[in-house]
Amino acid sequence: MNIHSGTKKYIILEIVLGILVVVLAGSMLFQKKEKEFYKVAVVLPDSDSRQWSSLKYGLRMASEDCEANMVVISTDDIASMEDEASIIQFAIKKGADAVIVKPIPGADSEELLQTISAKIPVMLIGSSAGYNRSQSAYATTEADAAALVKQLVQEVLKDYGGDIRGKTFGIFSSDVASDVTYVKKGGVCSELERMGAQIDWKLTGNLNEDGLTILEKQKPVDVVLTLDDRSVVQAGTCSKENRLHGADVYGIGNSTESVYYLDNGSVKCLVVPDEFGAGYQCMTQVVHKLNGDIRKMEDQTVQYTVIRRSELFSERNQELLFIMSQ
């Protein structure tokens, strides 16, 4: 776990805000030369990561269709909703008319967003701000987490002749605290236990440089289930280097990196949420709100696709692969 001192956090936040000044100023000056479009700030952690490629492409396509100006803001090294809220408030001061945010979950996150939503429309993407999705006051666009893990287990069943009784499993998620993580972990454990499988270990957290070593030291299992894109990539890397003791890897992923490990056989199957659709729907609903739609913004659930190595480059998957590569 990385522990930031108060001074380091302050410096990081100042750097992020400084970069944001340049990005927003340049973007808004450009738009004034053309036409006064609505300005939508999109706040994502590690926004340059490939896991967001499909999402950003969907946001960009919708912003062009809806004639909105999109500015993507990264929250790299920002570990709390307080800091994320400061970045959003700064974006508002610089002219943002609405915000789409992947929130950093926390006990006070919903309350912090209230001061923002009182000024401009706020749409969440990927997870709610708190730990209980049903109690969230904000519209969220995301895949059905319970459906994703249920499908993941079904794919394992297909490869094991419909019977996984006595088979051993490891469960890995890089996302620590979101409501989506709780739903995924709870759902996959319930499914496996119901079918008589044995869960030997659960691993949670972004493992960074030590990831391969930590994974390698886990008890050998028959199957490793990875519940998000980063964990797919880390487990796929470990599998490729023969450091997972022969375990089959199945995962929920949406980046070209995840597909790479599927293509080379390190991952057996991917369940891919429609991140393009999530981005497109988010932006469309936000701009409709800015254009005077009096209806409350609503939760939106996107679909998913199952892809395997044998059909990776099929005609059905060509569009999906194209979107991932944008």
Predicted segments, located by residue:
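Hinge/cleft segment of the Venus flytrap/periplasmic-binding protein
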Residues: K9, L13-E14, F172, G277, ...
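Hydrophobic membrane-insertion alpha-helices, especially the h-region
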Residues: I12-S27
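Short beta-strand segments enriched in small/hydrophobic residues
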Residues: M28-L55, V72, Q135-S136, K167-A177
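Flexible loop/hinge segments that line or gate small-molecule binding clefts
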Residues: D108-D144, S255-D263
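Short, well-structured alpha-helical segments in soluble
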Residues: E82-D97, N208-P220
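Hydrophobic alpha-helical
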Residues: V101-A118, V188, L203-V259
